[in-house]
């Protein structure tokens, strides 16, 4: 495709009505995120129902979650740092620069994959023990992680490079990237876990095969002729002026996801102290439900990101403001509906992951506390993703650091001492307290930074 034609094709991001455009991009992306949620939790759903050992196996795989989050965080750092910069370059009609960013990001993902796989295969058992595995759960955790580690390269390329597909406006293609792997995982899981009797090893193998299928789809598209930005060998040589800004912008996304890993370790250690394996197992369920809550919000933000980034690059302040306003409204509506469902029907969510009566009863009470202020969290997600879409790395990092490191981690250890009569539930209470304070901070910071960005666009 000729460069001039490419420019005309992508100009819809600056011309189509914002409302219609947002939903055209967001609905497939949200569907992809929901499918991705099933992709991530389907292992836990099947594992939790393994006869005789489901509860312990679920807890063991739950201990692997901090590691899986770190792997995803590296992919997100490269993808979330590179994709907005590439879209901004497209808005400025600088396709050569955009393809340079794309090529460098592929190389970064390959390098990161080799390093992560080596570390996990060499030190996996020691890491799991440090992350909260007990004598009862360590073998289940190792069985899953040893197989998952082999497929790290597929995770990196699928999650990291799929953002470049969505960022160009190919939301349906991005959705299919996730759908292919999700359907494969849902089909393969019961076959490997139950029919072949592989247990948690089967779940890990199903995940690796599914990710490989998604990876093949993503890379085939970005190497093909239908994409605006194409992977080319000459652009894969790392350049400092591309790598440093990309990783700097993606650092906020990395902090958000890797901090989830650190937080998971903190939760597990504190819960193991006050409630044993039962409390850690419940946390596996709570984080799975939280994934369900967060991924559609992330999908909406990813649908809005190309519109905001493109029009920011084109200095169209009106469309940027209109897109953000609509994003906040939709996020709030979704958050409120989900909050009501969790508070009214917690057992529906918990029973998806376990048939153990004790874990089911405990999990319902913990879930209500853990997601007590979910109804306002859509505001922070909208601010966070808009900061990234505008290329404001500093503000994105500030929001990420505030919620995770300054608020939540200290509260995990502080609240059990303040509520000594029920320290176990006080651990779960740390999440809603941190959410409330971080939403206030993110909204205040965004009010100042967004006005500044609008003035810059209007001043050009």
What are these regions (language model features)?
Residues 58-118, 155-174, 282-340, 344-346, ...:
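Small-residue-rich hydrophobic transmembrane alpha-helices
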Residues 1-29, 86-151, 195-250, 308-373, ...:
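Short alpha-helical transmembrane segments in multi-pass integral membrane proteins
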Residues 55-66, 141, 145, 204, ...:
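Small-residue hotspots at the loop-to-helix junctions and early N-terminal turns
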Residues 34, 38-58, 128-135, 191-198, ...:
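Helix-terminus/linker motif at the lipid-water interface of multi-pass membrane proteins
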Residues 23, 38-39, 78, 119-123, ...:
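Residue-level signal for transmembrane alpha-helical positions in Major Facilitator Superfamily
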Residues 79, 148-166, 177-182, 203-216, ...:
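Short runs within selected transmembrane alpha-helices of multi-pass transporters and secretion channels
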Residues 13-45, 49-53, 66-81, 85, ...:
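N-terminal transmembrane alpha-helices
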Residues 24-43, 147, 181, 210-214, ...:
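Transmembrane helical elements of multi-pass membrane transporters/channels
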């Amino acid at each position: 495709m000729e460069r001039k034609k490419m420019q005309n094709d992508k100009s819809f991001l600056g011309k189509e009505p914002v409302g219609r455009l947002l939903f055209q991009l967001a609905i497939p992306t949200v569907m992809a995120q929901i499918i991705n949620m099933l992709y991530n939790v389907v292992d836990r759903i099947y594992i939790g129902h393994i006869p005789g050992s489901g509860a312990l196996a679920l807890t063991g795989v739950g201990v692997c979650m901090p590691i899986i989050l770190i792997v995803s965080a590296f992919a997100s750092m490269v993808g979330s740092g590179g994709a907005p910069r590439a879209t901004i370059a497209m808005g400025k009609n600088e396709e050569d620069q955009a393809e340079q960013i794309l090529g460098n990001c592929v190389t970064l993902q390959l390098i990161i994959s080799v390093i992560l796989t080596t570390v996990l295969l060499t030190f996996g058992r020691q890491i799991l023990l440090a992350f909260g595995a007990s004598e009862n759960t360590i073998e289940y955790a190792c069985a899953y992680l040893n197989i998952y580690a082999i497929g790290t390269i597929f995770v990196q390329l699928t999650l990291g490079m799929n953002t470049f597909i969505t960022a160009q406006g190919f939301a349906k293609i991005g959705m299919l990237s996730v759908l292919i792997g999700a359907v494969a995982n849902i089909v393969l899981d019961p076959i490997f876990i139950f029919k072949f009797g592989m247990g948690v090893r089967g779940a890990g193998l199903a995940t690796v095969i599914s990710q490989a299928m998604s990876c093949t789809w993503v890379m085939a598209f970005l190497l093909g002729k239908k994409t605006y930005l194409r992977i080319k060998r000459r652009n894969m040589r790392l350049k400092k002026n591309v790598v440093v800004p990309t990783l700097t912008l993606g650092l906020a996304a990395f902090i958000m996801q890797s901090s989830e890993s650190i937080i998971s370790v903190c939760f597990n250690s504190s819960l193991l102290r006050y409630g044993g394996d039962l409390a850690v197992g419940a946390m596996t369920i709570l984080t799975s439900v939280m994934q369900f809550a967060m991924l559609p919000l992330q999908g909406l933000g990813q649908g809005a990101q190309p519109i905001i980034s493109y029009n920011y690059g084109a200095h169209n302040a009106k469309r940027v403001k209109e897109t953000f306003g609509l994003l906040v409204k939709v996020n709030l509506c979704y958050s409120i509906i989900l909050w009501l469902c969790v508070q009214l029907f917690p057992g529906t969510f918990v029973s998806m992951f376990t048939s153990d009566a004790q874990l089911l009863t405990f999990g319902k009470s913990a879930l209500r506390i853990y997601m007590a202020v979910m109804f306002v969290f859509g505001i922070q997600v909208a601010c966070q993703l808009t900061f990234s879409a505008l290329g404001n790395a500093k503000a994105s990092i500030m929001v990420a650091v505030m919620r995770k490191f300054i608020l939540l981690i200290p509260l995990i250890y502080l609240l059990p001492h303040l509520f000594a009569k029920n320290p176990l539930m006080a651990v779960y209470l740390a999440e809603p307290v941190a959410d409330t304070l971080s939403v206030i901070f993110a909204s205040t910071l965004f009010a100042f930074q967004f006005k500044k960005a609008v003035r810059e666009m209007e001043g050009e």
